[in-house]
């Protein structure tokens, strides 16, 4: 049995940097990364204004997914969990 390792810190930092390029998204957190064969798997929680529509939240996740796949490859597995901004520290 071999435990999964996270991607290198510099890769995780780049992932967070790409996510933070989206102005409506705040406080990416709970980042989990790993390699699946030659591809990357990325799971992360993001916060958005709780008043935006589900459609807009979906658009934002698609934009972020596109940017991440452009950087890390089209087979990158991405899970974005969207949460509402709930405290000042999230802004």
Residue spans for each PLM region:
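Alpha-helical transmembrane segments and adjacent TM-loop junctions that form the membrane-embedded core
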Residues: 1-91
């Amino acid at each position: 049995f071999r435990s999964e390792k996270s991607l290198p810190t510099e890769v995780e930092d780049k992932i967070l940097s790409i996510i933070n390029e989206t102005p409506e998204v705040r406080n990416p957190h709970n980042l989990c990364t790993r390699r699946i064969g030659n591809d990357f798997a990325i799971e992360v929680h993001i916060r958005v204004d709780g008043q935006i529509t589900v459609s807009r939240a979906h658009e934002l996740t698609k934009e972020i997914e596109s940017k991440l796949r452009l950087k890390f490859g089209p087979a990158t597995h991405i899970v974005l969990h969207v949460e509402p901004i709930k405290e000042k520290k999230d802004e």
